[in-house]
Amino acid sequence: MIVIKAGGRVIKNNLDGIIESLSNVGEQAIFVHGGGDQVTETSKKLGIEPVFVTSPEGIRSRYTSKEELEVFIMVMSLISRQIVSKLAYKKKVISLTGADGNSVIAERKKKIIIIDERGRKRIVDGGYTGKIKKVDSLVISDLLKSFDLLVFAPLAYDPEEKTLLNVDGDQMAFAIATAMKADTLILLTDVEGVLVDGKVINKLTSKEAKELSKRIGPGMNRKLLMAGETIENGVKKVIISSGLVQDPISNALQLRGTVIM
């Protein structure tokens, strides 16, 4: 069983290619998708100006207000349905959020630390973003008895506050892959792999991935850190590869990109 995650830029620029590639996967799979660019576009059309914040580590992320959460749910649900409708002729596929069967549980971030426009640290309300606390592998295993492909939007469920939460798509993919002890986790990005001095690093051990995460830019550093931890927790390999090429999943399974084992 494999877990595949495609980031928002990949979804925006190569959704049809991703769908075609998913149709050719010959084993059971779980697909986690992003869609941040589409959320931003839709928010602006609705007159809601998106807000982004920067963490002390330099990571820029969406600030999810209650109003923005509603747009996020709407857009992510649309993307999920587009994927399902174009694959249903060939595969038994279902779209899900973490609220379905309480499959992915998260806790709302009550407070977050940001760097303001003056470069100072500030503590602000966390909005409707969450940190994943639990993946119910039994629920997901039962679903895989009936379906070939599960499509997850990056929305987890907070049972305490009875709400869906925006969660990091990478975090969701890593959490699901770890809980399911997946053979392979594929991260499809807008680059060919982990780049150092303009060249793709082909292979890394889990230890090397965690070490390199301290010396590489925001975004990829978290992927490498989580990849190292995921390998140590039972996933056989993590592949970071381009989602913009033809048949990107097959391309990744041919170990083109960066392979962490």
Swiss-Prot record:
Recorded superkingdom: Archaea
Keyword Kinase found: yes
Any one Pfam family match given in the protein's UniProt record, by short name: AA_kinase
Binding site for substrate: G35, G36, R62, N166
InterPro entries with a match to the protein in the record: AceGlu_kinase-like_sf, AcgluKinase_fam, Asp/Glu/Uridylate_kinase, LysZ
Protein task: Involved in both the arginine and lysine biosynthetic pathways. Phosphorylates the LysW-bound precursors glutamate (for arginine biosynthesis), respectively alpha-aminoadipate (for lysine biosynthesis).
Protein name in the entry: [LysW]-aminoadipate/[LysW]-glutamate kinase
Species of provenance: Sulfurisphaera tokodaii (strain DSM 16993 / JCM 10545 / NBRC 100140 / 7)
Lineage: Archaea, Thermoproteota, Thermoprotei, Sulfolobales, Sulfolobaceae
